[in-house]
Amino acid sequence: MAIIGERLKTLRLEKKPTQREIAEAVHITEVSYQRYEYGSVRPSLDTLIALADYFDVSLDYLVGRSDDPRRLP
């Protein structure tokens, strides 16, 4: 679970949105997003997909199954 939080934080810091902006974009609360980033709660599959879409990375990258963030066409 920690890998998801680490990846979320890295992506957020690279792209510069606030936690609130991300949460609003994927229709979750800011507190929920913070918990995902801190690794204290695991996001649902729907939320993981929304986050991967938001950051334009593959779901495999977000969950740690790949080190390549690119999405396959």
Question: Which stretches of residues belong to each language-model region?
Answer:
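Short amphipathic helical patch at the helix-1/turn junction of helix-turn-helix
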Residues: A2, L13-E14, R42
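Conserved hydrophobic/aromatic packing and binding residues within compact polymer-binding modules
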Residues: L8, I22-A23, Y33-Y36, L62
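DNA major-groove recognition helix of helix-turn-helix
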Residues: E37, F55, S66
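Short, basic-rich loop-to-helix N-cap that marks the start of a DNA-contacting helix
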Residues: S40-A50, R71
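DNA major-groove recognition helix of helix-turn-helix/homeodomain DNA-binding modules
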Residues: H27, D46-Y61
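Short basic helix-loop element that most often maps to the first helix and adjoining turn
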Residues: E6-A25, A50
